[in-house]
From Swiss-Prot:
Family the entry assigns: Belongs to the RecA family.
Main localization, broad class: cytoplasm
Keywords: ATP-binding, Cytoplasm, DNA damage, DNA recombination, DNA repair, DNA-binding, Nucleotide-binding, SOS response
Residue positions binding ATP: 67-74
Pfam families linked to this entry: RecA (PF00154), RecA_C (PF21096)
GO annotation (BP), single: DNA repair
GO cellular component, one term: cytosol
Taxon lineage: Bacteria, Pseudomonadati, Campylobacterota, Epsilonproteobacteria, Campylobacterales
Full protein name: Protein RecA
Keyword Magnesium: no
Subcellular location: Cytoplasm
Described function: Can catalyze the hydrolysis of ATP in the presence of single-stranded DNA, the ATP-dependent uptake of single-stranded DNA by duplex DNA, and the ATP-dependent hybridization of homologous single-stranded DNAs. It interacts with LexA causing its activation and leading to its autocatalytic cleavage.
Length: 347
């Protein structure tokens, strides 16, 4: 709809005044600038990348990964770091829990020699480090593990039994207000790992679970991922890993509420090859007859673990199956598919 000359002149003058006061580009028409699709960092899980809708964690955004203990939250964060480092990105890990396992991180493919690590003494220090790294514009991905461990200084220095109502929530709210404006300019991605707590007095109405750190993080996040362990993987009598379900409960960059299931193997992390087999079966690329897995005329092995071992030892065959699976899913077309239909395969 055309604007009359007088209004147009007034608008142009207003834009010039705003640009002069706050800098060029402060106010613009969307049609004057070409916007590129949101770039993403792979999570290391094919299914979760699909569920997120853009092929991974969105760059330049705040993301929350939460769930019960030992559900795979830190593993997911470390796998994302490994993926980012392979793309030449600079990554940092703010270890507020002081529990980072360097050997495990190496096993997941993290370049620990070039990973920036901070183990802060209290919450304010952790968030100051986070803000400084973000403002520098030199760090692409920062993990904060975890929100629950961001204890305010006054609580640490106080006596046992002292009450500190809402201190951590106020701290998080202030930090997130400052961070949001910076992230857009520096394109830094921040992933907060969070724990869940039980609400008191829900009386059966609504979910009894909530996350720590107040409500601010829920609002400022572009993506929230709920990670749950749903089964234990066994080989004979030995436990070798967990089957995990990740549900995207909030997504500002794609449709939400999609979910994915994948295996996390003890000491190895997310089983990408296991996902290839699962998706291969769903897409009729890999055949499963009884306990036997095969690809065309090639026998992959009896049992999923043997099939995974065959593909691990034969990179050429693995790449061939991977190419066909990705082509069958096709990250443009498949991002709109129902994740519940393709997220889990026959065991």
């Amino acid at each position: 709809m055309a604007m009359d000359a007088q209004k147009q002149k007034a608008l142009d003058m207003a834009i010039k005044q705003i640009d002069k006061t706050f800098g060029k580009g402060t106010l613009m028409r969307l049609g004057d600038k070409e916007f590129e699709p949101i770039a993403a960092i792979s999570t290391g899980s094919l299914g979760l990348d699909m569920a997120l809708g853009i092929g991974g964690i969105p760059q330049g955004r705040i993301v929350e990964v939460y769930g019960p203990e030992s559900s795979g939250k830190t593993t997911l964060a470390l796998q994302t770091i490994a993926s980012a480092q392979k793309e030449g990105m600079v990554c940092a890990f703010i270890d507020a829990e002081h529990a980072l396992d360097v050997v495990y991180a190496k096993n997941l493919g993290v370049d620990t020699d070039n990973l920036l690590v901070s183990q802060p003494d209290f919450g304010e220090q952790a968030l100051d480090v986070l803000e400084t790294l973000t403002r520098s514009g030199a760090v692409d991905l920062i993990i904060v593990d975890s929100v629950a461990a961001l204890t305010p200084k006054s609580e640490i220095e106080g006596d046992m039994g002292d009450t500190h109502v809402g201190l951590q929530a106020r701290l998080m709210s202030q930090a997130l207000r400052k961070l949001t404006a910076i992230l857009h300019k520096t394109n830094t991605t921040v992933i907060f790992i969070n724990q869940i707590r039980m609400k008191i007095g829900t009386m059966g109405y609504g979910s009894p679970e909530t996350t720590t750190g107040g409500n601010a993080l829920k609002f400022y996040c572009s993506v929230r991922i709920d990670v749950r362990r749903i089964a234990t993987l066994k080989q004979g009598e030995s436990q070798i890993g967990n089957r995990v379900k990740a549900k995207v409960v909030k997504n500002k960059v794609a449709p939400p509420f999609r979910q994915a299931e994948f295996d996390i193997m003890f000491g190895e992390g997310i089983s990408y090859i296991g996902e290839l087999i699962d998706y291969g079966i769903k897409m009729d690329i890999v055949d499963k007859s009884g306990a036997w897995f095969s690809y065309g005329a090639e026998k992959l092995g009896q049992g999923k673990e043997n099939a995974k071992l065959t593909l691990k030892e034969n990179p050429k065959l693995r790449e061939e199956i991977e190419m066909q699976v990705k082509e069958a899913l096709g990250f443009g077309e498949a991002l709109g598919m129902d994740q519940e239909e393709i997220s889990s395969a026959d065991q």
